[in-house]
Swiss-Prot record:
PTM section of the record: Methylated by PrmC. Methylation increases the termination efficiency of RF1.
PANTHER family recorded: LD18447P
GO cellular component, one term: cytoplasm
Organism for this UniProt entry: Chlamydia felis (strain Fe/C-56) (Chlamydophila felis)
Name recorded for this polypeptide: Peptide chain release factor 1
Role according to the record: Peptide chain release factor 1 directs the termination of translation in response to the peptide chain termination codons UAG and UAA.
Gene responsible for this protein: prfA
Keywords attached to this entry: Cytoplasm, Methylation, Protein biosynthesis
Segments traversing the membrane: none
Record GO terms (molecular function): translation release factor activity, codon specific
Family: Belongs to the prokaryotic/mitochondrial release factor family.
Cell compartment(s), UniProt: Cytoplasm
Amino acid sequence: MEKKILEYLKRLEEVEVKISDPEIFNNPKEYSSLSREHARLTELKNVYDKVLRHEKILNDDKHALAQEKDPEMIAMLEEGIQSGKSEIEKLYKILENLLVPPDPDDDLNVIMELRAGTGGDEAALFVGDCVRMYHLYASAKGWKYEELSASESDIGGYKEYVMGISGTGVKRLLQYEAGTHRVQRVPETETQGRVHTSAITVAVLPEPAEDDEEVFVDEKDLKIDTFRASGAGGQHVNVTDSAVRITHLPTGVVVTCQDERSQHKNKAKAMRILKARIRDAEMQRRHKEASAMRSAQVGSGDRSERIRTYNFSQNRVTDHRIGLTLYNLDKVMEGDLDTITSALVSHAYHQLFQNGNEENS
Protein backbone atom coordinates (compact mmCIF):
# COMPACT_ATOMS: atom_id res chain seq x y z
CA MET A 1 0.00 0.00 0.00
CA GLU A 2 2.86 2.37 0.89
CA LYS A 3 4.33 2.12 -2.62
CA LYS A 4 0.99 2.90 -4.27
CA ILE A 5 0.38 5.87 -1.95
CA LEU A 6 3.76 7.39 -2.83
CA GLU A 7 2.98 6.94 -6.55
CA TYR A 8 -0.29 8.84 -6.10
CA LEU A 9 1.41 11.62 -4.11
CA LYS A 10 3.88 12.05 -6.97
CA ARG A 11 0.94 12.18 -9.38
CA LEU A 12 -0.66 14.88 -7.20
CA GLU A 13 2.42 17.08 -7.70
CA GLU A 14 2.15 16.58 -11.48
CA VAL A 15 -1.56 17.45 -11.47
CA GLU A 16 -0.93 20.60 -9.41
CA VAL A 17 1.61 21.78 -12.00
CA LYS A 18 -0.83 21.14 -14.87
CA ILE A 19 -3.81 22.73 -13.15
CA SER A 20 -1.83 25.90 -12.35
CA ASP A 21 -0.93 26.42 -16.02
CA PRO A 22 -3.20 29.19 -17.47
CA GLU A 23 -3.33 27.29 -20.78
CA ILE A 24 -5.47 24.60 -19.12
CA PHE A 25 -8.51 26.90 -19.23
CA ASN A 26 -8.49 26.60 -23.02
CA ASN A 27 -9.48 22.96 -22.59
CA PRO A 28 -12.51 22.88 -20.24
CA LYS A 29 -12.91 19.10 -20.51
CA GLU A 30 -9.31 18.40 -19.44
CA TYR A 31 -9.56 21.03 -16.69
CA SER A 32 -12.69 19.39 -15.32
CA SER A 33 -11.03 15.96 -15.37
CA LEU A 34 -7.87 17.24 -13.66
CA SER A 35 -9.93 19.11 -11.05
CA ARG A 36 -11.74 15.91 -10.07
CA GLU A 37 -8.44 14.01 -9.93
CA HIS A 38 -6.87 16.78 -7.86
CA ALA A 39 -9.73 16.68 -5.35
CA ARG A 40 -9.44 12.89 -4.97
CA LEU A 41 -5.64 12.90 -4.63
CA THR A 42 -5.74 15.81 -2.17
CA GLU A 43 -8.18 13.86 -0.01
CA LEU A 44 -5.85 10.85 -0.18
CA LYS A 45 -2.89 13.02 0.91
CA ASN A 46 -4.88 14.48 3.82
CA VAL A 47 -5.91 11.03 5.05
CA TYR A 48 -2.36 9.70 4.67
CA ASP A 49 -1.01 12.68 6.64
CA LYS A 50 -3.49 11.81 9.41
CA VAL A 51 -2.25 8.21 9.39
CA LEU A 52 1.36 9.36 9.78
CA ARG A 53 0.43 11.67 12.68
CA HIS A 54 -1.54 8.94 14.48
CA GLU A 55 1.24 6.39 13.92
CA LYS A 56 3.80 8.78 15.43
CA ILE A 57 1.59 9.34 18.50
CA LEU A 58 1.05 5.58 18.77
CA ASN A 59 4.79 4.85 18.66
CA ASP A 60 5.45 7.58 21.25
CA ASP A 61 2.79 6.08 23.55
CA LYS A 62 4.26 2.58 23.14
CA HIS A 63 7.72 3.89 23.97
CA ALA A 64 6.38 5.73 27.04
CA LEU A 65 4.45 2.63 28.17
CA ALA A 66 7.60 0.50 28.11
CA GLN A 67 9.21 2.86 30.62
CA GLU A 68 6.17 3.78 32.74
CA LYS A 69 5.77 2.45 36.31
CA ASP A 70 2.73 4.35 37.54
CA PRO A 71 -0.46 2.15 37.29
CA GLU A 72 -2.72 5.10 36.42
CA MET A 73 -0.40 6.30 33.67
CA ILE A 74 -0.07 2.74 32.34
CA ALA A 75 -3.87 2.42 32.14
CA MET A 76 -4.15 5.80 30.40
CA LEU A 77 -1.42 4.96 27.88
CA GLU A 78 -2.94 1.54 27.15
CA GLU A 79 -6.31 3.18 26.50
CA GLY A 80 -4.66 5.72 24.20
CA ILE A 81 -2.82 2.97 22.31
CA GLN A 82 -6.04 1.01 21.79
CA SER A 83 -7.87 4.12 20.61
CA GLY A 84 -4.99 5.00 18.28
CA LYS A 85 -4.96 1.54 16.71
CA SER A 86 -8.71 1.74 16.11
CA GLU A 87 -8.42 5.18 14.48
CA ILE A 88 -5.52 4.07 12.24
CA GLU A 89 -7.53 1.02 11.15
CA LYS A 90 -10.44 3.28 10.12
CA LEU A 91 -8.10 5.60 8.22
CA TYR A 92 -6.53 2.70 6.32
CA LYS A 93 -10.00 1.58 5.21
CA ILE A 94 -10.61 5.07 3.84
CA LEU A 95 -7.21 4.93 2.10
CA GLU A 96 -8.16 1.59 0.53
CA ASN A 97 -11.21 3.22 -1.05
CA LEU A 98 -9.19 6.20 -2.29
CA LEU A 99 -6.48 3.98 -3.78
CA VAL A 100 -8.97 2.26 -6.09
CA PRO A 101 -9.02 4.16 -9.42
CA PRO A 102 -12.42 5.85 -9.80
CA ASP A 103 -14.92 4.33 -12.18
CA PRO A 104 -15.61 6.90 -14.92
CA ASP A 105 -19.26 5.81 -14.77
CA ASP A 106 -19.66 6.57 -11.04
CA ASP A 107 -21.50 9.84 -11.64
CA LEU A 108 -23.74 8.57 -14.43
CA ASN A 109 -27.46 8.91 -13.86
CA VAL A 110 -29.39 5.67 -13.53
CA ILE A 111 -32.71 4.20 -14.56
CA MET A 112 -34.14 1.80 -11.97
CA GLU A 113 -36.72 -0.80 -12.95
CA LEU A 114 -38.71 -2.45 -10.15
CA ARG A 115 -40.93 -5.44 -10.95
CA ALA A 116 -43.25 -7.53 -8.81
CA GLY A 117 -42.14 -11.17 -8.67
CA THR A 118 -43.44 -14.08 -6.61
CA GLY A 119 -46.17 -13.15 -4.16
CA GLY A 120 -48.80 -11.53 -6.38
CA ASP A 121 -50.53 -8.54 -4.81
CA GLU A 122 -48.15 -8.45 -1.84
CA ALA A 123 -45.18 -8.21 -4.21
CA ALA A 124 -46.85 -5.32 -6.06
CA LEU A 125 -47.43 -3.52 -2.76
CA PHE A 126 -43.77 -3.99 -1.85
CA VAL A 127 -42.74 -2.48 -5.20
CA GLY A 128 -44.73 0.58 -4.10
CA ASP A 129 -42.96 0.60 -0.73
CA CYS A 130 -39.53 0.41 -2.40
CA VAL A 131 -40.42 3.13 -4.91
CA ARG A 132 -41.17 5.38 -1.94
CA MET A 133 -37.95 4.25 -0.18
CA TYR A 134 -35.77 5.11 -3.17
CA HIS A 135 -37.63 8.39 -3.70
CA LEU A 136 -36.95 9.42 -0.08
CA TYR A 137 -33.31 8.33 -0.36
CA ALA A 138 -32.87 10.37 -3.55
CA SER A 139 -34.38 13.43 -1.84
CA ALA A 140 -32.08 13.02 1.17
CA LYS A 141 -29.04 12.86 -1.14
CA GLY A 142 -30.15 15.92 -3.11
CA TRP A 143 -30.67 13.89 -6.28
CA LYS A 144 -33.31 14.51 -8.93
CA TYR A 145 -36.05 11.86 -9.07
CA GLU A 146 -38.32 11.25 -12.06
CA GLU A 147 -41.08 8.76 -12.79
CA LEU A 148 -40.56 7.33 -16.28
CA SER A 149 -43.15 4.56 -16.43
CA ALA A 150 -45.62 2.93 -14.04
CA SER A 151 -47.96 -0.04 -14.29
CA GLU A 152 -50.27 0.12 -11.29
CA SER A 153 -51.72 -2.89 -9.50
CA ASP A 154 -55.48 -3.08 -8.95
CA ILE A 155 -55.10 -3.11 -5.13
CA GLY A 156 -52.29 -0.53 -4.93
CA GLY A 157 -48.58 -0.65 -5.53
CA TYR A 158 -47.12 -1.44 -8.93
CA LYS A 159 -46.63 -4.44 -11.17
CA GLU A 160 -43.74 -2.50 -12.69
CA TYR A 161 -42.22 0.90 -12.00
CA VAL A 162 -39.41 2.68 -13.84
CA MET A 163 -37.69 5.73 -12.36
CA GLY A 164 -34.82 7.98 -13.35
CA ILE A 165 -32.41 9.27 -10.69
CA SER A 166 -29.74 11.85 -11.45
CA GLY A 167 -27.04 13.55 -9.39
CA THR A 168 -23.51 13.18 -8.06
CA GLY A 169 -22.49 9.63 -7.15
CA VAL A 170 -25.85 8.11 -8.15
CA LYS A 171 -24.48 5.08 -9.98
CA ARG A 172 -21.73 4.48 -7.40
CA LEU A 173 -24.24 4.20 -4.54
CA LEU A 174 -27.22 2.59 -6.29
CA GLN A 175 -25.56 0.02 -8.58
CA TYR A 176 -25.61 -2.68 -5.89
CA GLU A 177 -29.40 -2.47 -5.51
CA ALA A 178 -29.72 -4.75 -8.56
CA GLY A 179 -31.08 -8.20 -7.78
CA THR A 180 -33.97 -9.88 -5.98
CA HIS A 181 -35.34 -8.21 -2.85
CA ARG A 182 -37.34 -10.57 -0.62
CA VAL A 183 -39.98 -9.33 1.83
CA GLN A 184 -41.39 -11.25 4.81
CA ARG A 185 -44.45 -9.75 6.50
CA VAL A 186 -48.08 -10.31 7.42
CA PRO A 187 -50.35 -8.94 4.65
CA GLU A 188 -53.22 -6.67 5.72
CA THR A 189 -55.66 -9.20 4.28
CA GLU A 190 -54.17 -12.07 6.33
CA THR A 191 -56.59 -12.95 9.17
CA GLN A 192 -54.49 -15.72 10.75
CA GLY A 193 -51.43 -13.54 11.27
CA ARG A 194 -49.25 -15.72 9.05
CA VAL A 195 -46.07 -14.28 7.58
CA HIS A 196 -46.00 -14.33 3.78
CA THR A 197 -42.84 -14.25 1.67
CA SER A 198 -42.81 -12.43 -1.65
CA ALA A 199 -40.15 -10.91 -3.87
CA ILE A 200 -39.47 -8.13 -6.32
CA THR A 201 -36.62 -7.65 -8.77
CA VAL A 202 -34.64 -4.45 -9.20
CA ALA A 203 -32.57 -3.55 -12.25
CA VAL A 204 -30.16 -0.61 -12.13
CA LEU A 205 -29.26 0.66 -15.60
CA PRO A 206 -26.65 3.43 -15.89
CA GLU A 207 -28.00 6.00 -18.32
CA PRO A 208 -25.57 6.65 -21.19
CA ALA A 209 -24.04 10.11 -21.24
CA GLU A 210 -25.03 12.28 -24.20
CA ASP A 211 -21.51 12.01 -25.65
CA ASP A 212 -21.32 8.22 -25.16
CA GLU A 213 -20.28 6.99 -28.60
CA GLU A 214 -20.69 3.33 -27.62
CA VAL A 215 -24.48 3.59 -27.47
CA PHE A 216 -25.62 4.58 -30.92
CA VAL A 217 -29.20 3.81 -31.86
CA ASP A 218 -29.98 4.11 -35.56
CA GLU A 219 -33.55 5.22 -36.30
CA LYS A 220 -33.81 2.61 -39.07
CA ASP A 221 -33.27 -0.12 -36.44
CA LEU A 222 -36.39 0.95 -34.56
CA LYS A 223 -39.99 -0.19 -34.90
CA ILE A 224 -42.25 2.42 -33.32
CA ASP A 225 -45.92 1.68 -32.55
CA THR A 226 -48.44 4.10 -31.07
CA PHE A 227 -51.67 3.25 -29.29
CA ARG A 228 -54.12 4.60 -26.74
CA ALA A 229 -52.89 4.67 -23.15
CA SER A 230 -54.76 2.47 -20.68
CA GLY A 231 -54.97 2.57 -16.89
CA ALA A 232 -55.39 -0.08 -14.21
CA GLY A 233 -58.03 -2.61 -15.25
CA GLY A 234 -57.39 -1.95 -18.93
CA GLN A 235 -59.67 1.05 -19.45
CA HIS A 236 -58.50 3.64 -21.97
CA VAL A 237 -57.48 6.91 -20.31
CA ASN A 238 -56.74 8.90 -23.44
CA VAL A 239 -58.62 9.38 -26.70
CA THR A 240 -55.45 9.92 -28.75
CA ASP A 241 -52.67 7.48 -29.61
CA SER A 242 -50.26 8.95 -27.07
CA ALA A 243 -48.72 5.68 -25.81
CA VAL A 244 -45.52 4.55 -27.51
CA ARG A 245 -43.91 1.15 -27.92
CA ILE A 246 -40.37 1.07 -29.34
CA THR A 247 -38.69 -2.15 -30.47
CA HIS A 248 -34.95 -2.21 -31.16
CA LEU A 249 -34.82 -4.78 -33.95
CA PRO A 250 -31.13 -5.85 -33.66
CA THR A 251 -31.43 -6.72 -29.94
CA GLY A 252 -35.15 -7.34 -29.51
CA VAL A 253 -35.33 -4.85 -26.63
CA VAL A 254 -38.88 -3.49 -26.24
CA VAL A 255 -39.89 -0.42 -24.22
CA THR A 256 -43.41 0.92 -23.68
CA CYS A 257 -44.27 4.34 -22.22
CA GLN A 258 -47.77 5.72 -21.74
CA ASP A 259 -47.64 7.91 -18.62
CA GLU A 260 -47.53 11.25 -20.44
CA ARG A 261 -50.43 12.70 -22.43
CA SER A 262 -47.99 13.72 -25.14
CA GLN A 263 -46.79 11.11 -27.63
CA HIS A 264 -43.58 13.13 -28.04
CA LYS A 265 -42.81 12.99 -24.30
CA ASN A 266 -43.59 9.27 -24.12
CA LYS A 267 -41.26 8.61 -27.04
CA ALA A 268 -38.47 10.65 -25.40
CA LYS A 269 -38.81 8.68 -22.15
CA ALA A 270 -38.97 5.37 -24.00
CA MET A 271 -35.77 6.21 -25.90
CA ARG A 272 -33.96 6.97 -22.63
CA ILE A 273 -34.95 3.61 -21.19
CA LEU A 274 -34.15 1.83 -24.47
CA LYS A 275 -30.61 3.25 -24.62
CA ALA A 276 -30.00 2.35 -20.97
CA ARG A 277 -31.18 -1.23 -21.55
CA ILE A 278 -29.01 -1.62 -24.66
CA ARG A 279 -25.99 -0.29 -22.77
CA ASP A 280 -26.75 -2.60 -19.83
CA ALA A 281 -27.00 -5.64 -22.10
CA GLU A 282 -23.59 -4.81 -23.58
CA MET A 283 -22.05 -4.31 -20.13
CA GLN A 284 -23.52 -7.62 -18.90
CA ARG A 285 -21.95 -9.35 -21.91
CA ARG A 286 -18.57 -7.82 -21.16
CA HIS A 287 -18.79 -8.77 -17.48
CA LYS A 288 -19.42 -12.39 -18.38
CA GLU A 289 -16.31 -12.37 -20.53
CA ALA A 290 -14.12 -10.78 -17.86
CA SER A 291 -13.74 -13.16 -14.90
CA ALA A 292 -11.62 -10.62 -13.04
CA MET A 293 -14.44 -8.11 -13.24
CA ARG A 294 -16.93 -10.70 -11.99
CA SER A 295 -14.85 -11.52 -8.94
CA ALA A 296 -14.62 -7.84 -8.10
CA GLN A 297 -18.38 -7.35 -8.04
CA VAL A 298 -20.50 -7.44 -4.90
CA GLY A 299 -22.58 -10.39 -5.98
CA SER A 300 -23.14 -11.05 -9.63
CA GLY A 301 -25.63 -8.25 -10.24
CA ASP A 302 -27.89 -10.93 -11.70
CA ARG A 303 -31.58 -10.05 -11.40
CA SER A 304 -32.26 -13.59 -10.14
CA GLU A 305 -29.76 -13.33 -7.27
CA ARG A 306 -31.41 -12.85 -3.86
CA ILE A 307 -29.50 -9.95 -2.40
CA ARG A 308 -31.58 -8.69 0.52
CA THR A 309 -34.36 -9.74 2.89
CA TYR A 310 -36.75 -7.32 4.60
CA ASN A 311 -38.41 -8.92 7.66
CA PHE A 312 -41.06 -6.54 9.00
CA SER A 313 -42.07 -8.49 12.12
CA GLN A 314 -38.45 -8.43 13.35
CA ASN A 315 -37.74 -4.90 12.03
CA ARG A 316 -34.76 -6.55 10.35
CA VAL A 317 -33.03 -6.05 7.00
CA THR A 318 -30.24 -8.40 5.89
CA ASP A 319 -27.95 -7.97 2.90
CA HIS A 320 -26.83 -11.50 2.07
CA ARG A 321 -23.82 -10.52 -0.05
CA ILE A 322 -21.85 -8.97 2.79
CA GLY A 323 -23.61 -10.55 5.78
CA LEU A 324 -24.89 -7.19 7.02
CA THR A 325 -27.93 -7.30 9.34
CA LEU A 326 -29.60 -4.18 10.72
CA TYR A 327 -32.57 -3.92 13.07
CA ASN A 328 -33.85 -0.59 11.80
CA LEU A 329 -36.03 -1.64 8.87
CA ASP A 330 -38.52 1.10 9.75
CA LYS A 331 -35.83 3.73 9.11
CA VAL A 332 -34.56 1.97 5.98
CA MET A 333 -38.05 2.08 4.46
CA GLU A 334 -38.06 5.83 5.19
CA GLY A 335 -35.06 6.23 2.89
CA ASP A 336 -32.24 5.76 5.43
CA LEU A 337 -30.14 3.60 3.10
CA ASP A 338 -26.70 5.14 3.62
CA THR A 339 -25.44 2.47 6.04
CA ILE A 340 -26.25 -0.28 3.53
CA THR A 341 -25.08 1.46 0.35
CA SER A 342 -21.84 2.69 1.97
CA ALA A 343 -21.04 -0.79 3.32
CA LEU A 344 -21.58 -2.31 -0.14
CA VAL A 345 -19.35 0.28 -1.82
CA SER A 346 -16.61 -0.23 0.81
CA HIS A 347 -16.79 -4.00 0.36
CA ALA A 348 -16.54 -3.67 -3.42
CA TYR A 349 -13.58 -1.28 -3.12
CA HIS A 350 -11.84 -3.66 -0.72
CA GLN A 351 -12.22 -6.49 -3.24
CA LEU A 352 -10.95 -4.30 -6.08
CA PHE A 353 -8.00 -3.20 -3.94
CA GLN A 354 -7.15 -6.82 -3.07
CA ASN A 355 -7.42 -7.85 -6.72
CA GLY A 356 -5.16 -4.97 -7.72
CA ASN A 357 -2.55 -6.04 -5.18
CA GLU A 358 -2.68 -9.66 -6.41
CA GLU A 359 -2.15 -8.52 -10.01
CA ASN A 360 0.83 -6.36 -9.02
CA SER A 361 2.47 -9.01 -6.80
